[in-house]
Amino acid sequence: MSVQFIVLFRDDDDNKDDSCKLLLYHDLTAHMLSTNEKEQKIGIIKGMWRFSNEFSQSNDYCHVELDSYSMLVLEVEPSYYLALGFENTHNSQWPKYKVRLSQCYQFFAMQHGKMQDIEDKTLSGLLNEHFIPFWDEINLIPDYFLMQDINTAIDDKMFPCCQFADALNSISEVKDWQNYLKNNVLLSEENYLNIKDVCVYHLPKNNKNTKEYGFITNFDPQFKSLPTLSNWLVGIDSMYGTVSSHGLAGTMSLTETEQQIELDAEEAHHEQPPNIKTVWDNVTLPITFTMDALKDIGQLTGVSNSLSLFTNMKPSWNLWSSSSENGAGSAKLDDKDEYSWLISPLNPSFLPKVYQMRKFYLQFDDWSQYNILFWKFKDVIVAVIVDPSFKKISEESFLMKLQEELWNGISLFYENTGFEKRQCSFDYTILFKEEGKYYSSIPRWKNGLDESDTALKLVIKGLDETLQFLTNNANRKSSVATVTEVGHDMSLTDHPIPSDPSKGEDGTEKTDKSESSIFSKLNESQLVELNKELMVILGTRSLTVWYKDANTKERMLKLNNGLMVYLLENNRKLVLIIKNWFIDSQQKTKSKRSTDMIESLGKDVSTWWNRIKDHEPL
C-alpha cells in the first residue's frame, strides 16, 4: 500500500489560537485515529510548511521524509492545505505523487468549483466523495507510481499529444477536417458564441503506439483549462482501460473482487464485519436502477421481456452484450456501434443527470461553469463545451444535427490521420513548458483489466450492487461496466463508416514490422525498471517549471543496461532522448570533432533533432 493518509484543512492567516478547520482526514491503512492524534499530525504538517517557507517564500509545496513515512503538502488555495502521506520505499517517486496530488485537486475544482466558495459542511462531504475513491483506487494497483512515465513527474499541467508527420516536415497548415469542424460547428450562425470550444482526442484501446495517443486539437487559444480537462480524460482511460459513459459520468470505480477481499481477510486473520449500510442502500436504491437490474435479469433468464415497451420509449442502449458472448464475429463492430453520444441529454432520463450533461468549472477569459457533452467515433473522443445559457443543446433535433457535423469532420480525419509513423532507432520525450504539451514515443502505462484478472474489477455505483442483491450472487464476476455502454443509437444510414488506415478489412489491427518504440516489447516489470532509471536521471536536475532567463543545459549519460540518455533543458522545453547503444545497428563512421553533444547519439538522432529543434509544439 503506497498512500497512507490524506488530509485537507483550512488555516486562516489571521488565526491567532493556532487551531484550524479540518475538512478531510482519511487514513487508507484503516487505522482508527483519535482526535488528538489527528491534531498532532496536522501540527506536524503546519510546522513543516512554516519551516520550509522560512527558506523560500515562492514554494507552493513542501516535501519531507520522516521516520515512518514521507509527506507532501500543497497550498491548493489561499489558506487551504492538502497533505499526502506515503511509504518511504517510494520516496524517490515523490515528484509523481506531487503532480498527481495537485491534479486530484484540479479535478475537484473543475467539477465542484473553488473550495473557498463552498460552505464548510457541504465542502466536507464533497471532499470525501472525490478524494477518498481517487486514492483508494490508486492504492489497489501495485507500483502505480513506479509505472507512471517520467512525464507525470515534471508538472501537473503536462498532457500527452498526438504526433503528426507534417509537423516533423515543417508543414503547419490547418487540415480539412479542422476547417470543417471550425466552420460548421463553432462558427455556424446557430452555434457561434454558444459552443465555446471543441476538444478532440485520439485514445486507442490497444495503447501500442504512444505517438498516436492523446490530445489532437482544440479551437480556442484562450481555453486555459485545457490541461486539466485533458489530464482528467486521459486519467479515466488509463485507470479503467477505456473511456465510457460510466467513466465520464463518474459512476465507475475500481474495486477488489470478492475473492481478493477474502484473501486479504485471511492474511489479516480476521473477518470484516458485515456492511449494514451497503445492505440498506441496496434495499433503498432508486427504482430506476432496479428497473435496469430487472432488465438485465430478463436478458439472463429469458423472462420479463415486457420491459421492452418501456425501454422503447427512450433512446436505445448498446445492449448488454460482451465480446465473449458474441464469439469471433464480434471483432468487427456494427456501424451504429462505431459512434455515439457518451454524455448527452439524449441518454435515458431515468439515469443520473451526470449522464445527460457534465457541468464543469473552466477558464476561458474568466472562471465560470460550462456544460460539457462527450461524443465518440472509433478511437476519437470529442468534448463539446457549451455556454450554460444555450438551451437548444437539450433538443434532440439539434443534437442529431450536431452529431452529423461531428461525424463529417472526424470522417475526414480518418481518411488520412497523418500520424507520424517513421521508424526510429531511439525514443524521446519533448515537453513544452508554457503550453503544457508533451510528445513522447516511450510506452505509457494503461490498466489492462480483463476477466482473467481475479484481483480487480470495474463496477458501476448503484447498479452492480443492485444486480448482486437481486440475483443473490455475491461472487458475480462480470460487471455492467465491462459489458455495457450508454449511448444514443443515432445511425447515419446514408453514410458509410470510413475505414481506419491502421486496420485491416476485418477491423483488426494491421501488423507493422517496424516497431514504434525501441521499448515496445517491454513487459510491465521492465517498464517499471525503465521508469526508475529515468527518474534517477531527472532527480539530478532542477525540476524547474518555467524561468525566462535560463541558459540551455544538456547532459549525456551511459547506463550499465545499455541505454544512452541525452537530456536538454532551456526556458522553452525539456528534451529526453534514449538510445540503446548495445544494439545500435547504424554503421559507426569517423567524423570531424563537433561541439554538439547530441551528435554522439548517431546521425539518425542528429538528423531528426535538426529537423524539429526549432519547432513550436508539434
From Swiss-Prot:
Q: Indicate the principal place this protein occupies in or around the cell.
A: membrane
User: Which UniProt keywords are listed?
Assistant: Autophagy, Endosome, Membrane, Protein transport, Transport, Vacuole
**Taxonomic superkingdom:** Eukaryota
Q: Which InterPro entries does this entry report, sorted A to Z? A: Ccz1 (IPR013176), CCZ1/INTU/HSP4_longin_1 (IPR043987)
What GO terms in the biological process aspect are recorded for it? autophagy; protein transport; vesicle-mediated transport
Q: Name one Pfam family in it.
A: Intu_longin_1
Note down the stretches annotated as region Disordered: 490-517
* Feature: compositional bias, Basic and acidic residues: 502-515
Record's bilayer topology term: Peripheral membrane protein
GO cellular component term of the entry, any: vacuolar membrane
Q: What subcellular locations does the record give?
A: Endosome, Multivesicular body membrane; Prevacuolar compartment membrane; Vacuole membrane; Vesicle
What is the similarity comment for this entry? Belongs to the CCZ1 family.
The job of this chain, per UniProt, is described as: In complex with MON1, is required for multiple vacuole delivery pathways including the cytoplasm to vacuole transport (Cvt), autophagy, pexophagy and endocytosis. The MON1-CCZ1 complex acts at the fusion of vesicles with the vacuole, through its regulation of the SNARE complex during the coordinated priming and docking stages of fusion, and particularly at the stage of tethering/docking.
PANTHER family noted in UniProt = VACUOLAR FUSION PROTEIN CCZ1 HOMOLOG-RELATED
Subunit structure as annotated in this protein's UniProt entry: Forms a complex with MON1.
Which protein, by its recorded name, is this?
Answer: Vacuolar fusion protein CCZ1
Q: Which organism is it from?
A: Kluyveromyces lactis (strain ATCC 8585 / CBS 2359 / DSM 70799 / NBRC 1267 / NRRL Y-1140 / WM37) (Yeast)
Which gene name belongs to this protein? CCZ1
